Amino acid sequence: MRTFVSGGKTVTVFPAGVPDAPVVYLNTFGDEGQKVFDALASCGCPPLSLVAVSGLDWNHDMAPWDCPAVFKNAESFTGGADESLRLLAGEILPRAERELAGTPRWRGIAGYSLAGLFALYALYKSDVFSRAASVSGSLWFPGFREYVFSHAPKRRPDRVYFSVGDRESKTKNPVRQTVQENTVAICGI
């Protein structure tokens, strides 16, 4: 495991231990990279390297554009995803992959909640990832469904994983109520 700081973000590289293993980039809310890497190993996943990025300003770094707060007493979203993606693809990725043995067979991006939204958004703004996982992605984000339907990914991904909880849309918040409907619609394209 190696850790470095880039653009104010803490980056932890968990090498697979075998050459040319796939690599997954995971934007984390806290610092759960080690737990995720250990869980992947314990459940018998094929070897892969994990690059966990933490120290994020969640409502800025993961949001594709400005948007007023959708939760009571919450901060607004300040649309820094393009900047975050430039940092990830331009600085973090090359430095992290110098720590790996060989060349990754494929490169994926994954995230939970707003980071799941960011993972999908990255496919539309960059061609560096061939796979993505949006785990309980914030696909309720205003305008995102329309964005996906009016734009094409920079490259056709090999695989995309979506998940949404059974009760995520069962909320009084009218914006968040759209999460399941939006996830199903986006998954269908």
Indicate where each model-derived feature is located.
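Gly/Ala-rich beta-loop-alpha elbow adjacent to hydrolase catalytic centers
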Residues: 110-115, 119
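Conserved hydrolase catalytic core segment
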Residues: 121-131
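Short beta-strand immediately N-terminal to the catalytic nucleophile in serine-hydrolase-like folds
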Residues: 106-111, 135
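Serine-hydrolase catalytic machinery in alpha/beta-hydrolase-like enzymes
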Residues: 12, 20-99
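N-terminal cap/lid segment of alpha/beta-hydrolase-fold proteins
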Residues: 1-16
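A conserved amphipathic alpha-helix that caps or lines the catalytic cleft of carbohydrate-
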Residues: 40-41, 123, 187
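A general structural motif
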Residues: 20-22, 47, 104-106, 129, ...
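The feature captures the conserved acid-bearing segment of alpha/beta-hydrolase catalytic domains
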Residues: 139-189
